[in-house]
């Protein structure tokens, strides 16, 4: 598989719901369509919240690693 080219990394370690998703929303606004935001989190709620956010906001969750903490999510900005 090709390596995912990350545009920006967002560290939300230590933050709890709803802060991680709020920060993702804030940071992704400043990215261009097609850019990738790597989100690093340790809040178990992000395993549900990040995929839901992507679907609702029409972004693409390219990959997630949620077997071990820290969790990692690669979010590609949509339109």
UniProtKB/Swiss-Prot annotation:
Keywords attached to this entry: Cytoplasm
S-S pairs: none
Compartment(s) of residence: Cytoplasm
Keyword Cytoplasm: yes
Domain of life assignment: Bacteria
Entry annotation: catalytic residues: 17 (cysteine persulfide intermediate)
Pfam families cross-referenced by the UniProt entry: TusA (PF01206)
SUPFAM superfamilies per record: SirA-like
InterPro entries per UniProt: Sulphur_carrier_TusA, TusA-like, TusA-like_sf
A GO molecular-function descriptor: sulfur carrier activity
GO CC terms: cytoplasm
A biological process from GO: tRNA wobble position uridine thiolation
PANTHER family: SULFUR CARRIER PROTEIN TUSA, SULFUR CARRIER PROTEIN YEDF-RELATED
Family, as annotated: Belongs to the sulfur carrier protein TusA family.
Function field: Sulfur carrier protein which probably makes part of a sulfur-relay system.
Protein name as catalogued: Sulfur carrier protein TusA
